[in-house]
Amino acid sequence: MASKGPSASASPENSSAGGPSGSSNGAGESGGQDSTFECNICLDTAKDAVISLCGHLFCWPCLHQWLETRPNRQVCPVCKAGISRDKVIPLYGRGSTGQQDPREKTPPRPQGQRPEPENRGGFQGFGFGDGGFQMSFGIGAFPFGIFATAFNINDGRPPPAVPGTPQYVDEQFLSRLFLFVALVIMFWLLIA
């Protein structure tokens, strides 16, 4: 009887011990599926998981790219708290093969790509500036490209004349003459 009591009491303990271990295995298996960490940037299973001091979990490659693209404003992508390479903690799980700090591994930089130059075609070699041909469309004396002409954008004209030279005096005279003509035309439009 005494031997039955301990064996009987051992049996429930074994079954209860087996139950939790069995349930923990079952929970571990189902928890294994649910216990994968998701990166808050790519929303995929975190590779080389790191956790920020504010409690958000990321893949190290994703967080590294986030920090590299914003060197002046390093904030957590989720809560905008301050974050840096030194303010994240690597996570190591059971069964992980490598115990190397993921912060020591820097993802490879993407290869640069040079786009092909565009084919200008058309008017090359005809003496139109640098090979391009420009036109300004407008109605009468009011071109639609007024900002392009006023700010000398994409223009192949020579620089203005140096003050004091005869060319400068001639340009000033022509400028005033055309201003006077423009004012006369505008006055005529107002009274007509």
Swiss-Prot record:
GO terms of molecular function: protein-containing complex binding; ubiquitin binding; ubiquitin protein ligase activity; ubiquitin-like protein conjugating enzyme binding; zinc ion binding
Region spans: Required for ubiquitin ligase activity and protection against ER stress-induced cell death: 29-80
Parts of the chain on the Mitochondrial intermembrane side: 152-171
Resulting phenotype, residue 39 to S: Decreased ubiquitin ligase activity
Pfam families named in the record: zf-C3HC4 (PF00097)
Zinc finger (RING-type): 39-80
Keywords: Autophagy, Endoplasmic reticulum, Immunity, Innate immunity, Membrane, Metal-binding, Mitochondrion, Mitochondrion outer membrane, Transferase, Transmembrane, Transmembrane helix, Ubl conjugation pathway, Zinc, Zinc-finger
Top-level division of the source organism's lineage: Eukaryota
Pathway in which this enzyme or protein is active: Protein modification; protein ubiquitination
Parts of the chain on the Cytoplasmic side: 1-130
Swiss-Prot/TrEMBL induction comment: Up-regulated by unfolded protein response (UPR) and endoplasmic reticulum (ER) stress triggered by thapsigargin or tunicamycin.
Gene Ontology CC: one annotated term: endoplasmic reticulum
Gene Ontology process terms (BP): autophagy; defense response to virus; endoplasmic reticulum mannose trimming; ERAD pathway; innate immune response; positive regulation of ERAD pathway; positive regulation of innate immune response; positive regulation of type I interferon-mediated signaling pathway
Disordered, as annotated region: 1-30, 90-123
Subcellular location: Mitochondrion outer membrane; Endoplasmic reticulum membrane
PROSITE patterns linked: ZF_RING_1 (PS00518), ZF_RING_2 (PS50089)
The protein's enzyme class: transferase
Reaction catalyzed: S-ubiquitinyl-[E2 ubiquitin-conjugating enzyme]-L-cysteine + [acceptor protein]-L-lysine = [E2 ubiquitin-conjugating enzyme]-L-cysteine + N(6)-ubiquitinyl-[acceptor protein]-L-lysine
First-listed, main subcellular location of the protein, grouped into a coarse class: mitochondrion
InterPro entries: RNF5/RNF185-like (IPR045103), Znf_C3HC4_RING-type (IPR018957), Znf_RING (IPR001841), Znf_RING/FYVE/PHD (IPR013083), Znf_RING_CS (IPR017907)
Quaternary organization: Interacts with ATG5 and BNIP1.
Record function comment: E3 ubiquitin-protein ligase that regulates selective mitochondrial autophagy by mediating 'Lys-63'-linked polyubiquitination of BNIP1. Acts in the endoplasmic reticulum (ER)-associated degradation (ERAD) pathway, which targets misfolded proteins that accumulate in the endoplasmic reticulum (ER) for ubiquitination and subsequent proteasome-mediated degradation. Protects cells from ER stress-induced apoptosis. Responsible for the cotranslational ubiquitination and degradation of CFTR in the ERAD pathway.
Domain comment as written in the entry: The RING-type zinc finger domain is responsible for E3 ubiquitin ligase activity.
Descriptive protein name: E3 ubiquitin-protein ligase RNF185
Source species taxonomy: Eukaryota, Metazoa, Chordata, Craniata, Vertebrata
Gene that encodes it: RNF185
